[in-house]
Regions:
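Conserved small/polar residues in nucleotide/adenosyl-binding loops
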Residues: 263-270
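Catalytic cores of large soluble enzymes that bind and process phosphate-bearing ligands
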Residues: 24, 93, 97, 193, ...
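Short beta-alpha connecting loops at secondary-structure transitions
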Residues: 190, 261-262
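Conserved N-terminal phosphate-binding loop of PLP-dependent enzymes in the Aspartate aminotransferase
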Residues: 145, 244-245
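Conserved SAM/AdoMet-binding glycine-rich loop
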Residues: 8, 110-230
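Proteins enriched for Cys/Gly/acidic motifs involved in redox and nucleic-acid/cofactor modification
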Residues: 1-124, 177, 199-210, 234, ...
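Anionic group-transfer/hydrolysis microenvironments
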Residues: 74, 180-184, 222, 254, ...
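Hydrophobic alpha-helix-in-membranes signature
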Residues: 86, 153-155, 225, 254, ...
Length: 270
């Protein structure tokens, strides 16, 4: 069992899945050939250590016959939202080298792909040496033959004026922004550790709409977060009415074992 599932469910796998011989987390993949080449595996092999440095810099996926290529530019997250397991399964933030990203994008274009989606658990917190996300976005935009560029998922706290300016400057950057709100109540946002208020979020969304005419804005909403009241939910609706999102991904809260918040208030059922 490999990847995030191995990272988050290793104890359950050990206790209840005796047929599992190897449990490897997402940052231990380089050891896999050595492990598989062992003649005998008599005991379970487990390696779920997380690295502060592993950024998958030298791995270029093989792509065939497509339009959109997904290109990971960073891994992990430092935000520690209380509902999210990503920092515990993917580790802390680390970014790929800018030149490595550009080489992968260029190879995808050479292979016939016309659209690129830049990926990261917190994509706009990208930082490699002196380059930030807006620097990378601009360099990718200059690649000949690349018709469309998207990126996901950004964090509102890291959405900078520089990113908005670059989006406005280059026609091949799609005029759309995914801006996860999660909740519209400041009390719930604080419990979620989202590090912004609803007023700051509305101001950011309106700035994006003013500076990027006809921009499409989508969002994520969590409903039924522990302790959420009807009043809290009504405030979420107020933000949605103020911003007028083009699309919203709505999710009922579900607890993730191992997240940093020990919930003491029950999750609303209705």
């Amino acid at each position: 069992v490999l990847g995030c599932m191995a990272q988050s469910l290793k104890h359950d796998l050990l206790e209840n899945k005796p047929y599992v011989d190897i449990i490897i987390g997402p940052d231990s993949y380089r050891k896999l050939p050595e492990i598989l080449n062992r003649e005998n595996i008599n005991n379970s092999i487990i390696d779920t250590s997380l690295s502060r440095f592993e950024a998958y810099n030298d791995l270029f996926p093989k792509r065939n016959n497509g339009v959109n290529a997904w290109v990971s530019i960073m891994r992990g997250c430092d935000k520690f939202c209380t509902f999210c397991i990503v920092p515990f399964t993917r580790g802390r933030e680390r970014s790929r080298d800018l030149n490595g990203v550009l080489l992968e994008v260029q190879k995808a274009v050479d292979d016939g792909f016309s659209e690129i989606t830049l990926l990261g658990q917190n994509v706009n917190s990208y930082k490699s040496k002196n380059n930030k996300f807006h620097n990378l976005l601009e360099e990718v935009s200059k690649i000949n033959g690349l018709k469309r560029i998207r990126y996901t998922s950004p964090h509102p706290k890291d959405m900078s004026d520089e990113v908005i300016n670059i989006m406005n400057k280059y026609d091949n950057i799609c005029n759309s922004v995914h801006l996860p709100l999660q909740a519209g109540s400041n009390r719930i946002l604080k419990r979620m550790n989202r590090t912004y208020t609803k007023e700051q979020f509305i101001s950011l969304a309106q700035k994006i709409q003013n500076r990027l005419p006809n921009v499409g804005i989508s969002t994520d909403i969590i409903v039924g977060f522990p302790g959420e009241t009807n009043s809290d939910f009504e405030q979420t609706l107020e933000v949605m009415n103020a911003v007028k999102f083009d699309f919203a991904f709505n999710f009922k809260f579900s607890a993730r074992r191992g997240t940093c918040l020990l919930y003491t208030s029950p999750s609303p059922r209705d």
